[in-house]
Amino acid sequence: MRMKKDIRAYEYEELQKELERLGEKPFRAKQIYEWLHVKLADRFDEMTNLSVKLREKLAEEYDIFPVQMAERQQSKLDGTNKFLFRLYDGNMVESVLMRYKHGNSVCISSQAGCRMGCVFCASTIGGLKRNLSASEMLGQIYQIQKIIGERVSNVVIMGT
């Protein structure tokens, strides 16, 4: 069984070309891109302005690899939230949300695992597994935005 491509990994122009390859009009790329990156859809069946046939075709060709929240901890001291996310392959990554007057900042993982050995961080257990895709890094931000119902305004990327 072949692994499907992650549709979130495509830049806008690449998505247009992919849809043309599938026999679709270029304007569909804008609709899908908006579902993926503005409305934060995790499934093709959420894309209600696309025909059922197109959604089925997309599901045959592509996956949307969402990160799934496994755990959330909130600091009683300052309200900082730490998230543990599960990736499509079972690897786990950590992200941190810090709320400020000027907006929401997140620290996201760029790697599954870590070689640094910091005692306060669960990511270091087991060492470095692999680098994350851009889509997986975006997925952390998107999931946090969905969970808190607010926009993230600043991003810090953790990794070695």
Which residues does each PLM region occupy?
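Flexible, acidic/Gly-rich N-terminal and inter-domain linker regions that tether
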Residues: 1-104
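Conserved Radical SAM active-site core
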Residues: 93-160
